[in-house]
Amino acid sequence: MRSLALLCAVLALSDGITRLPLERGKKLREILREKGLLHHFLQHHRYDIGTKFPHAFPDVLTVVTEPLLNTLDMEYYGTISIGTPPQDFTVVFDTGSSNLWVPSVSCTSPACQSHQMFNPSQSSTYKSTGQNLSIHYGTGDMEGTVGCDTVTVASLMDTNQLFGLSTSEPGQFFVYVKFDGILGLGYPSLAADGITPVFDNMVNESLLEQNLFSVYLSREPMGSMVVFGGIDESYFTGSINWIPVSYQGYWQISMDSIIVNKQEIACSSGCQAIIDTGTSLVAGPASDINDIQSAVGANQNTYGEYSVNCSHILAMPDVVFVIGGIQYPVPALAYTEQNGQGTCMSSFQNSSADLWILGDVFIRVYYSIFDRANNRVGLAKAI
């Protein structure tokens, strides 16, 4: 993983955009399964992707806090550095949240001790704010403080960035996650304590050619990319379809319907969807997800997950998301995944939220552009 830092130290190329490579790692779900701990985790921690998005509807928004983050299915990571001289951290680039945080050397939790920890005393540019920060998880609260320092993302140097330093991380299971922290790429309205997100500081400091970023996710361990300040046409074919952001908090859009076997099966009266790089699955209301699972032939196992017969995948139907009148089919090869034990799992997940979360399963099929200048999302068929 740390060898990735060399790749991340790329210069902004002549086309005026900056690329940061991502690595696809093993999900915590699979690590816990291999260690025989998944059943225990699911018994003791209510896992609900929908709790990550408490503010998806502005009419019920009262207090803006950092959204809940579920780490069970995060799988794409990149390397950034903080401080002078730089200290490297592996982070999830998460369009479903807006704060940056990493572990602090002041944290004695096992989860911190098993990851890279930021040492403020070793950075000549670090400034303490005296401010506290609490980030809520399905497994408990992450407590920390807020510091200010230089944050470098690929060749982009943000010299005055507020970020969270965790002093306590909840739950023994955080020991096993493959990333050190989170870098949120959502709108500023989601950020805890009014902290300006990293992307907004990049824009404010005129570091980007354009006020947008784009994401390509590969199924392979290497090859994924976040592109800051532009669009890389080598990652997609055909034209870009643009969809307006319906609520400027998450990267939230309006979806028309969901079709399986030419039948409208969910979201029949229209619904809201969030394009989220920090969730690997596609999640939606439980009744709709159950209908999709039934339509594609998935069966529930003892963990509450849904599995399919691996030999049937090529015959399984596409799940088609209709957005702005355009159909976006996701084939069975994209929405199923072998779990390493000879079983193929469905990547559709129940959620308590009355909205859809189009995570990495969807983004792997459609190159995604997050255009803040025009408050819109662009989708194009990924290579």
Swiss-Prot record:
Organism: Gallus gallus (Chicken)
Signal peptide start-end: 1-16
GO molecular function: aspartic-type endopeptidase activity
Glycosylation sites: N132, N204, N309, N350
Presence of the UniProt keyword Glycoprotein in the record: yes
Pfam families: A1_Propeptide (PF07966), Asp (PF00026)
Active site: D94, D276
Keyword Protease attributed: yes
PANTHER family: BETA-SITE APP-CLEAVING ENZYME, ISOFORM A-RELATED, CHYMOSIN
Protein name: Embryonic pepsinogen
Domain of life: Eukaryota
Cystine pairs: C107-C112, C267-C271, C310-C344
Domain Peptidase A1: 76-380
EC number: 3.4.23.-
This protein's UniProt keywords: Aspartyl protease, Digestion, Disulfide bond, Glycoprotein, Hydrolase, Protease, Signal
CDD domains in alphabetical order: pepsin_A (cd05478)
Family membership noted in the UniProt record: Belongs to the peptidase A1 family.
Record-linked InterPro entries: Aspartic_peptidase_A1, Aspartic_peptidase_AS, Aspartic_peptidase_N, Pepsin_A, PEPTIDASE_A1, Peptidase_aspartic_dom_sf
Enzyme class: hydrolase
